[in-house]
Amino acid sequence: MRKKPFIVDYFYKNSLDQAIELWLPIPDRLGQETLKPSQLHRLPTGENLGYFILHKNDTLHFQYTREWYTSKEKTIPLSKEEEEYYLRDTILSPVNKETLDLARDITIGINSKRDQAKAIFRYIVTNYKYKYPPKSRGVKSFLRYKNGDCAEFSFLFSSLCRSLGIPTRTLFGSWSFGKMNGHAWNEIYLEDEGWIAVDVSMANLRKHNILRFLYSDLRTMWWEKYFGKTEGQRVVFSRDSEIKLMPAFGDSKGKSIAIEPLQINDRAFYWGQESLKGAAPYLQPAYVKIDTQNFLPNTSIGVENLLGTWKVKETGWRGFLAQSKKYLAMIALATMGVNYINSNNYLEFLFKFSFVALFSCFVLRRERPFLFSIFLVIMILSLLSTINELL
């Protein structure tokens, strides 16, 4: 399959009256950047972790390209250190007696690692519900409440697979369109296949929403296809959760009400003020350290202070079609509205032609192909009727 590049644009401006520490995975090739990292560390995941110090009004901005996501890599054996890393016990994805007992119950009579992982995949998809935002993050709370978002589905899948000795990692990234459109999923390592993709939360949404197939990509029409395959329209920021921060993150002694706490395993966690035993819960794409002890009374913290902002844009013919959709939608709706007020065969032709072009863009991009194929056929027939009247 031909690769289709995306442009990732990340931006962080320090608008606070203090210096900010920021950790961020740095791609090997950057298109442009405004600041160089003060330190650069190689992570066990193979990524480079950049450490930045941003003073008041400093801006970090960089762009880079990413190819169409695929987990298929050369089947390179994991080193002992890598295997241990992807089998580790963490706060968000624990490996303990409870997870081992559950994993064994799910996989009774199943011997191969691939089949065990697929049984776990099916179990989670069938027995848990998607909910955003989740009440609390982490496997402990997910097992209790039986619902959560993409991260919780991924944490539990990692936890159960690791409990059976299957190297697993939780990926954090973004859908390849729009702004701040985050997502999390998994990859498992199999000796004869290498790393393969698994998206439990998308499979769950596909299975439990009977009309979801109308919105599906052709490659993942059936929910079980999300074991070993994705639609590819996503980019990766970091290749596991709980990545140790270097240099070390010093937890704040007190917590500020300026930041609403995140719940992790039903315990308040203050993003940007503490770590999980020296690690960021996840890098999507950044983690910051903010000193809130000297905040003025009316100081408020927004998402842009905690994460920065990112957007992903497609290039090439897919990018052209994505942009065309916006303009075609405006033309189609505007001309349809005018035609409704003042009926005119030429306006009717224009809005129907615009809708035909718009629906064609969706089909060519393989976005909701069944739904828009139906719309396209209906609109083409209607357009032909209008043309016949004009003639």
Give the positions of each predicted feature.
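Intrinsically disordered, low-complexity N-terminal segments that are enriched in acidic
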Residues: 1-70
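Low-complexity, Gly/Ser/Thr/Pro-rich intrinsically disordered linker/tail segments
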Residues: 6-8, 21, 219-324
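Secondary-structure boundary elements
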Residues: 60, 64-148, 156-158, 240-243, ...
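Hydrophobic/aromatic-rich core segments of domains that either
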Residues: 153-265
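A structural boundary/capping signal
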Residues: 159-163, 319, 336-339
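Membrane-helix interface "capping/anchor" motifs
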Residues: 362-373
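Juxtamembrane boundary at the C-terminal end of a transmembrane helix
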Residues: 383-391
